[in-house]
Design a protein with these regions (language model features):
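Alpha-helical architecture
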Residues: 95-99, 127-129
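Post-HEXXH active-site segment of zinc metalloproteases
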Residues: 89, 105-129
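Surface-exposed helix-capping loop/turn segments at secondary-structure junctions
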Residues: 28, 109, 143-147
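A generic secondary-structure signal for well-formed alpha-helical elements
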Residues: 102-107, 139-143
Length: 165
């Protein structure tokens, strides 16, 4: 399950959003070391491939808070609307979502996709996208709630309606 046998997704977490914001905002458009936003190196131990990941942050008023991972360049882009926008938990959620896509790539799990090529409805139903959104939803639950709640109770598309590419 997930982290090469580690099981509990809570093993890898990010620094609090304000700390990430203080580090990332002055570096928009520049490569950011993923270590600088992780609480500890548990993720890097489980997935040494992340050491080579290039993380970029950018402003994009049209896109708002969004992100994407490009396996061809091993780059991850995290976008937030405007320099004055408050990060709160937005960047943390985008990082979780996009990191899950990289884990899917490494583990050869069901992958996500691009709504521009698949259409919004099919994209929303892709098993990799459902999993990545569910990782975010579960991350913000307490550890006790996460243990009590099945993944099927927090995912936004039932298993039988998901598309696996």
């Amino acid at each position: 399950m997930g982290l090469r046998g580690c099981g509990d997704m809570k093993l890898w977490t990010f620094l609090v959003s304000l700390t990430i914001e203080d580090y990332v905002k002055p570096r928009y458009g520049q490569p950011v070391n993923i270590r600088m936003v992780l609480r500890d190196d548990t993720l890097l131990k489980a997935y040494p491939e992340f050491e080579r990941l290039t993380l970029y942050a950018m402003y994009s008023p049209k896109r708002g808070t969004a992100g994407y991972y490009n396996p061809a360049t091993n780059g991850m882009v995290v976008s937030i609307g405007n320099p004055s926008d408050d990060f709160q938990y937005q960047i943390e959620g985008v990082l979780l979502h996009e990191i899950q896509h990289l884990i899917q790539e490494i583990e050869r799990f069901a992958k996500g996709g691009d709504p521009k090529t698949l259409g919004r409805s099919r994209y929303h139903r892709l098993a990799g996208e459902v999993e990545a959104r569910n990782i975010c939803a579960r991350h913000f639950l307490s550890q006790e709630d996460r243990r009590r709640t099945l993944r099927t109770e927090t995912q936004d598309v039932p298993d039988l309606k998901q598309i696996i590419l």
